[in-house]
Structures are given as C-alpha cells and as structure tokens.
Amino acid sequence: MEPLSHRGLPRLSWIDTLYSNFSYGADDYDAEGNEEQKGPPEGSETMPYIDESPTMSPQLSARSQGGGDSISPTPPEGLAPGVEAGKGLEMRKLVLSGFLASEEIYINQLEALLLPMKPLKATATTSQPVLTIQQIETIFYKIQDIYEIHKEFYDNLCPKVQQWDSQVTMGHLFQKLASQLGVYKAFVDNYKVALETAEKCSQSNNQFQKISEELKVKGPKDSRDSHTSVTMEALLYKPIDRVTRSTLVLHDLLKHTPVDHPDYPLLQDALRISQNFLSSINEDIDPRRTAVTTPKGETRQLVKDGFLVEVSEGSRKLRHVFLFTDVLLCAKLKKTSAGKHQQYDCKWYIPLADLVFPSPEESEASPQVHPFPDHELEDMKMKISALKSEIQKEKANKGQSRAIERLKKKMFENEFLLLLNSPTIPFRIHNRNGKSYLFLLSSDYERSEWREAIQKLQKKDLQAFVLSSVELQVLTGSCFKLRTVHNIPVTSNKDDDESPGLYGFLHVIVHSAKGFKQSANLYCTLEVDSFGYFVSKAKTRVFRDTTEPKWDEEFEIELEGSQSLRILCYEKCYDKTKVNKDNNEIVDKIMGKGQIQLDPQTVETKNWHTDVIEMNGIKVEFSMKFTSRDMSLKRTPSKKQSGVFGVKISVVTKRERSKVPYIVRQCVEEVEKRGIEEVGIYRISGVATDIQALKAVFDANNKDILLMLSDMDINAIAGTLKLYFRELPEPLLTDRLYPAFMEGIALSDPAAKENCMMHLLRSLPDPNLITFLFLLEHLKRVAEKEPVNKMSLHNLATVFGPTLLRPSEVESKAHLTSAADIWSHDVMAQVQVLLYYLQHPPISFAELKRNTLYFSTDV
C-alpha cells in the first residue's frame, strides 16, 4: 500500500483558514516572487501519508529521515481557567459550527456512495449481474458502517450547536467517535484493493462505468445547488481525508476550551485515541514514495525534490526541481485565481539517459554569473533581524494581529530575496541533445547530494525518451501531490513553538579522520545553516599523502539562528588541468559528508563535547562547545598584570609608551604587507590553535614575535587582531558611550548626526581614540582592494562593528530578553556606526581635538 498525506505542512483546519490573512509557504509564492492565492487541495488518486500532526506544526508532521516512527505531537494547551473564557467559548462555537457543516457534506458524500450499492446487489443474483457480490463487498467495504457512525454523531451534535449556551457539553460525542475509529483501519487496509477493483470493473462493464463516473451528491441544506456530480474514485478517498480532519478539529477545540471545562479531559482523551490510531495506521504503511506509472507500464517514482535557484536568461528564478527515477523536471508554481487547485508549470525536463555533467573545462566556457553585492545581502539580513525584533515586540505587547501579519509578510519578502540572491555555487547540467542549465546553490553539500542522487539512478539501464504533451501534463500534475518539500526554506515559515536556533559562537575542533582506503591530500570544510540556508564557514589545512589525517584545528563559527552543522571531507586536486578558474566552482573530490543537529541541550554547556561523524565509511572525530550571544557579551578582565589580552588599552599603551598597542600595529602591518589581497580577509576564520599560539607569544612579549608573524597564516593574524579587540575588558568605543552612539546613529538630520558622532569620538579616552582612528585608516585601505579581496567597507563594518561596539552586560540585561533579540536589536546599529566613520572623510586626531565647530552637551 502507498503511504497515506503530504509530508511537510499539514493541511490547515477550517478555523486557521478562516483567520489567516496571508500564508508564507511556497504554495502562495511563485518563482518570480509574486503572491498567489491558495486553493483547497483536491483528493488524490493514490493515498498520501495520513497527517497526524496538529495544525500549523510542520516539525511534528515530518517523519524522521530514516523512515522511523513519526513524532507524537503534544496536545495543545487549553485556555487557563477564567482567562478570556468567554471569547474562548465563542471560538469553540465557531469551530463546532464549521465542523458540523463539513460533517453534513461528508454524510451526503457517503450517502451518494451507498446509493448504487442496493441496486447493484439486487442485480448480482440475476442472470445479468453488473457486479458480483464479491466485487460489491470489496468496493463498498465498511462504507455503511462509517455512514452510520457519522450519522449518529451528527444527529447528536447538531441540536447542541443550534441551541448553544456556555454550559453545553459534547466531549463525550467526540470521545465515542474516536473510540469507533477501528472501522477506518479496516477501510484503509482495503482501500487500494477497492480502487483497483472499481477500475477493473469500469473497464469491463460500461454500465458500471457510467454509474461510477457520475454519482449525485446532495448539497448542504442552505445551498443553492441541489446536487453535484462526483466520481466514485473521488468519493472513496473522502474517508481517508476525513480521518485527519477529525483530529485537526480536536486540536482547535482544545485550543479554545478552558482547562476547567468538563469537556476538556474528554477531548484530550479523544485526541489521544485519534493520534494513536493515525500512528498505528502509518506504521503499517510501506514508506515507499507514491509512484506515477508511465504509459509503458513502468514505475516512475519521485526520488528527491527541493527548491533551487536557476539562472534563466541572465536572471535568478526560484524553481521546484523534481528528480524521478528516469527524469529530472524543473517546475514553477502556476499563478491561479482564488479557490482554484494549485498546479505546477513545467519549465523543462531532461531524461536521465540524456543528462550529463559538464567537465570543468566546459563549465569554464559557460557564461559566469556575477554574485550579488555582499553589502546588499548584509542589508537584507539586517532588515530581517530588525523585523524579527519588531514582531517579538508586537507579540510581547499583545499587538494587533494585522500589524504582526504585515511585519511577517515584509520579513517573508526579504527572506525570499535573500534566498534568491545569496547562492553562488554553480551546479551545471547538460542535455546531450541540446541545452545546458545552471543552478546556483549556497552549499557544496547540497550540490553533492543532487549530483550523487542523479548518478546513482544513471547506473540503471535507462532509455532515452520524449514525453508527449499529455504525458508531460500528467507527470507535472503529479508533482503537487508527490512533493515532499512544501515550503520555501525561510525562517518565517517556522511556527512560533519551533526552535529559533542558536545565536552565538560555536567552537569546533576537527581532530582527525580514519577509514580512507588509499593515501590522499585531505581537508575538511564546515557548513552551518543561517537565515534558512547553509553556508561554508571554515576550512582545515590540507593534510598531505595520508590515510589518517590529524588536523587538530579549532575554529570559531558565528551562529545566526543555526540548527545544523555539516562536515565535508575532500581530496585536494592539484592537477591544474582540472581546476576551474571560477572561484565558486569547487572541483576537489568529496570523499564523505555528514550532518548533525545542534541540539541546544547538548551544546549549551561550558564543556567540550566530543563526537564522531560517520560518512561513506569514513569517521571524522571532532569536538565542539557553544557560547551564547549573551554570554559572549561578558568581557572578563585579565587577572595578570602583564600581557596584552584582557588588559585595559590605557594600561598597555602606558606600559609600552606607545599611542597604539604593539599587537595592533604589528598585525595591521602584516595584513597590509601580504594579506590585503587575500579573499575574505577578516571574514574567513583563522585556525584557532594558530591564533592561540600568537596570543601566547604577544602576552609573553616573546622576542620571536616578528619571525612567527612572518611564517603564520594571514587569516590567523587577522583573527588574532579581532580576538584582541574582543577580549578587551570593555569595547574600544567604551560601555559609557554605547547608548549615545546608538542614539547618534539614529538621528535623521545629517548636520546633527555629524555634530553628535564627532563629539562622541572626542569624548573617547586618547588611547581608545588614536587606536580607533588607526584601525579606521587600515580598514579603508583593505576596502580599496575590494575587487580582489571581496571585502567592502560594509563587509568590514559587519565584521568589526559588533566587536568594537557592544552593549555592556548591565545594558543588555536591562533592555533585552533573549539572545536573538540582542542580535537583531543591536547589530544593525553597531554596523552602521562603524560604517559611518569608514565612509567619512579622513579624521585627524589633532584636528578633531581642536576643532570647535563640533559642539554638543556632555553625554
């Protein structure tokens, strides 16, 4: 038997549909970013996996990757005793009224299905039967029992809803209905056989074909339409659909029932029975993908699907890509009018027998795609973070739902643009009979997954073919029902009760790897998800000619709502004929890849957690620990009198008899000497062990500092400079002036802003000011090489802003409640402050001190 509903988002209950003004799933947004109205899903010909999750809780409906048991959802919390009880009971009546109306329609559908059964039975014993008794019992199995159960339920519930008062009870009716769900188990077990029997009988008997194609269903009592025509196949699907609907309404009822109401425990029990029933049904179902049959009778199954960015005619388009057993199909969601069933529009397809991956040389000849400017991507991230903060404030202040929906809509639009414009890793495919296609991905892990899935299918004996227009229409039509990825991967598609992810710093040590069959030049990369998509964050050095590399390299990775860590192991390619000049075209061979969930309970400890990840027969050992953002705000002064890290900048400059600390001058000099053209300088993490070694040398004032600097990786030197500023007992721009910097950057009038921002610089202690001005000029020189190093002023402000300017621990506790809020509330302003000074004409210390044009009251 095929699996019973759509995986991913469960269907909305009627009450959620009634009150939601805007939906943020992929179903409502087409590939060019236009809103679309969502129509109700139609009954599928094959049975989708029964959705046993509560409404709007995608994380509960998704089954585990390994095909294990589905997660049993927690019953929703009811209203606290006396809390908005009147409003809750009114909502309860609305829920029941809507459910009662749908129950009437369902009973009419069952009646229509039963109507031909009696005359068919009557002819079965004659000399010219339409169907045999056995065929009739197979097709209509348990329909009569289901009808009687629901008719009794409807007759008992209807008067209670029509004569409504706050004391009415009906929990016992739902409890009884749930206790009779066993009859559905028998129906589900027989469903596929019933469909096949009905289809065979239609093909062999014209009389039954006419009956099954036009069954008359009575309209509701208040409806203008007296009857509608429905096929028998569609009506046989209705009980499958209904069993999920009953569970959804129990969630809605519990949500709007006070916990001290007599119905509450009865409804809880009914929900428990229903969920257990759905779980038991789904455990019995073969978890194979629902299949589509080709005209030749071959089985075509969906293997993989997902959202990818395609470059088409020079512009980026979001596509939904479907990989079947013999064909790759690229589609976009059609724009449809309200109430119409949503469909996909096929943009192109390639039979896997004709699909080839171009060589690096062929890829190099392909038109290159210019990446979206980094500063614009950073601006989008800042906007998203600010909108998240506004939404949290509205919720905390119990703001109007319309205002929250407007903010959510804005956030979705910005996240959609970020998702569309951030990917840069090319994934090229070619049809040997014609055109080439280009997708852009944000993760090499994801590119590898698609490539491997296609290559695995291509090992089979595949034949080339051309789909007729009808065949293509049927295949494209099946995509809506078969898809496993329902939503664009953006954070605004998450429910409020889902984990927001981790915000802070993840320290990862990549120790070693085992399991390689022959010696190779090996390295690892680390990816984490951020804003809904994965990005590469760190890379180990290459360990040459070995089967057991021992890297023992530590990295500090900033997390922004992250939930997963990916580790990829590569064999380095030194053959220049295979190296693509495109920076984003990774041609090194992936030896293995793996992913782990960043469980807050596991990683949010002060201690290191060591683990092993297995990938393709390879075992990589690593350790990690996590520091939350609020913890990272704490600056611990150094207990030792000597050294430079964690020591006040005024103490260091006085001891050294210098205006700028020696460590700052030496790191800046080395970066400008040999790192100013390094791609991603200051953004790419240096090896943590190298940084710690440099820290120890500077703290000890070792005479070999200069020699060590000249031999050290430039990213480690850049990382040492960032670490120095981060470990200052207070940030370079001081705790005292932090609120004033926040207010100054928010001023609208340019003259007032200039006056305020210059006065604030003058208010800094001399060592802080001179060091800040020295760093400013250095960062401007780095940005001058942006065409080569890809580091704009905005990128540099994003890296250094939160390090040089941070709220004090007291300040952050007084105003903010969560780590996510700290990030979204402050980082935008911190970046803007530094960017203001970076974009300002050169500022001289002497001129700043004596200039009387800048005037302001004391801060």
Swiss-Prot record:
**What PROSITE patterns has UniProt attached to this entry?**
C2 (PS50004), DH_1 (PS00741), DH_2 (PS50010), PH_DOMAIN (PS50003), RHOGAP (PS50238)
Residues modified as Phosphoserine: S57
Q: Which UniProt keywords apply?
A: Cell projection, GTPase activation, Guanine-nucleotide releasing factor, Phosphoprotein, Synapse
Query: What GO molecular function annotation could you give as one example from this UniProt entry?
Result: guanyl-nucleotide exchange factor activity
Q: Which residues form the C2 domain?
A: 484-613
Major location (coarse): other
Subunit details: Interacts with DLG4.
The Swiss-Prot or TrEMBL note on domains reads: The central Dbl homology (DH) domain functions as a guanine nucleotide exchange factor (GEF) that modulates the GTPases CDC42, RHOA and RAC1. Promotes the conversion of CDC42, RHOA and RAC1 from the GDP-bound to the GTP-bound form. The C-terminus is a Rho-GAP domain which stimulates GTP hydrolysis by RAC1, RAC2 and CDC42. The protein has a unique structure having two opposing regulatory activities toward small GTP-binding proteins.
- According to its UniProt entry, what is the function of this protein? Protein with a unique structure having two opposing regulatory activities toward small GTP-binding proteins. The C-terminus is a GTPase-activating protein domain which stimulates GTP hydrolysis by RAC1, RAC2 and CDC42. Accelerates the intrinsic rate of GTP hydrolysis of RAC1 or CDC42, leading to down-regulation of the active GTP-bound form. The central Dbl homology (DH) domain functions as guanine nucleotide exchange factor (GEF) that modulates the GTPases CDC42, RHOA and RAC1. Promotes the conversion of CDC42, RHOA and RAC1 from the GDP-bound to the GTP-bound form.
Q: What name has this protein been given in UniProt? A: Active breakpoint cluster region-related protein
Organism equals Bos taurus
Q: What is the lineage of its organism?
A: Eukaryota, Metazoa, Chordata, Craniata, Vertebrata
